């Protein structure tokens, strides 16, 4: 080899070495690259409190775990984000998106941390969590009966501050006060006012979304297709929701509730259930009559301990005690509702009563409990949901209730929630959430437990009940609800050329005929599929546009 050839070879080797070294450094340090990029966009100064946490920070684990609502996912084996960003304004979200794109990190956006599969804070590839805890302002305009709510606010905060302004206004969101509005509203969001006003997503009139290019869009600038998609189609598919503008609704000055327990042999419970399933969805929209079933240990007349299934029938009625008792005695005398079973509450106290964070027997609760983000007991849990379109036969319901005995006492529960009311009148394509006319009720199966080592046992029980009920629920497709996300329905391999075909399997369960429109919106606004997870809407490949 002559000198010039050797020199060329040596220079090439040096260049190759440095290139390789640089590539390895950039791959090895996406966290450092992200931090450098972020600090260029958002200079760290005195006016700027700490926004970014890495695993080197003392507060990293407490911030990560603080809003993990499902204790299944607090474990050493759960994948952890390289970075947690806690933005306090839109510019911080913009910087996070641009820098994550630049260095090749995925984003998970967390509002309240209630995602049933933990997908607002878990990813199988290197990722950043955008934790919206510091973006929780609520600006209410009583005159126009609207409010701007930042996506990190909780339902409890929304209900509390609306009530502070006007006791006869509220918003039709869910029951649990610690749920964040970012995910809840963008997945649909049902609750006590659903039969009067529809879902939370039906009552959104504007939004601020930060898109894949880091631009902040409102309803006008994003256009009606994207605005349609984020109200029930999962905002995380299209960007990061920073705020919602919501339409407030009228609520009565008093409402009446009861929650009666029925402890009898299963055939007797099934008779009550059968009456319930044939009448609850037909009631006037001012009455919600829900039911749930759970096992409990009791002592029988002979002093022996035994496990029985208990049924609970619970109401929310827009009106007084006398009217409700009269209605129940005429329409459902088998329940035997008496005046002494009922309580009249203000609307805000009704909200608290059914919040799951106070004792049912406690009458002296303060509405400030709605502001407590740590209210309620956290457990590990698993949940699956079905929609029922025709009555479940009594013989089948006997067997379904008997399956509660296969689970630990008090660990498994079925909740049945009536549809009907205004839900019958809203088009299935009004927003991506399609489950409207023809749905009698939703039925969900859940298990909760304490110990990590019991995860598989309880998850498998929920799966077994879900499999058993297959013939009795909606079919072709078997419908599902995005806010009770279920990865058993299928996952999408975004590297696969068949990702649309894979996604359609679960997509049509969540969205019905609306799935294809969601795909078109995704293809238009995020063609390179930056915002993705195991169950995200895929864009069509370029040749299909």
UniProtKB/Swiss-Prot annotation:
Q: What is its EC number?
A: 1.21.3.7
Protein residues bound to cannabigerolate: 292, 417, 442
Q: Which residues form the signal peptide?
A: 1-28
What reaction(s) does this enzyme catalyze? Answer: cannabigerolate + O2 = Delta(9)-tetrahydrocannabinolate + H2O2
**Which biological process, per GO, is one annotated for this protein?**
terpenoid biosynthetic process
Its activity is regulated as follows: Inhibited by Hg(2+).
pH profile: Optimum pH is 5.5-6.0.
Q: Where FAD is bound, by residue?
A: 109-115, 120, 176, 180-184, 190, 236, 241, 481-483
- Outcome recorded upon mutating residue 108 to A: Strongly reduced catalytic activity
Q: What else does UniProt say about it?
A: THCA synthase might contribute to the self-defense of Cannabis plants by producing both THCA and hydrogen peroxide, but since these reaction products are toxic to the plant itself, THCA synthase must be secreted from secretory cells into the storage cavity to avoid cellular damage.
Family label: Belongs to the oxygen-dependent FAD-linked oxidoreductase family.
Name of the protein this chain belongs to? Tetrahydrocannabinolic acid synthase
